[in-house]
Amino acid sequence: AARFAFDQILSNGACGAAMVAAMVMYMSSDPYDYSLSEPDKPAKAIDSGLYIVATPIGNLADMSQRAIDMLRAADLIAVEDSRVTGKLLHHLGLKKRMRPYHDHSSEADRDALLAVARDGVVVLVSDAGTPLISDPGYKLVRAAREAGIAVSTAPGASAVIAALSISGLPTDRFLFAGFLPSKAKA
């Protein structure tokens, strides 16, 4: 809706430029406010629990409506890097509370997420692709299941499957043993 509004404003020439300036004045000065001044669309009601949501691996438009609805309904989003997830939330026009969850997160961090998931909606995302694939989120999922907290997913992009699908190799059997290191070892 915001993109359509900007397109309409820009097509009106000089008058449109004044309207854009007025809209910029209404944008929040809060560095964690990733939305324009218009409120989020109402979230679809979903049950409390932990939701594993895949994020795009290169094109921000590659996200399912169900995944967007889960993000919209989230009380808290567990993220690897708030800067990366912030870009996605901005693209979607959402303003949400985020909490870091990564390799260096403590048991106390995990317990804090579970406390919210007992009565609210916690969404776990990775920087790109499906959480828990070469990712520390499995500890959170295991702890949620042990605590009797519902766990669900909105599947989507996976770098492993995307690479396999364009490799030309047979796809009926394959082994994933982790991603190649990003830096050569000395």
How would you name each of these model-derived features?
Residues D111-S158:
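Glycine/small-residue-rich loop that forms an oxyanion/phosphate-binding "nest" at active or ligand-binding sites
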Residues S82-R83, P100-E107, A157-S158, G178-K183:
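Short, acidic/turn-prone active-site loops that include or flank metal/cofactor-
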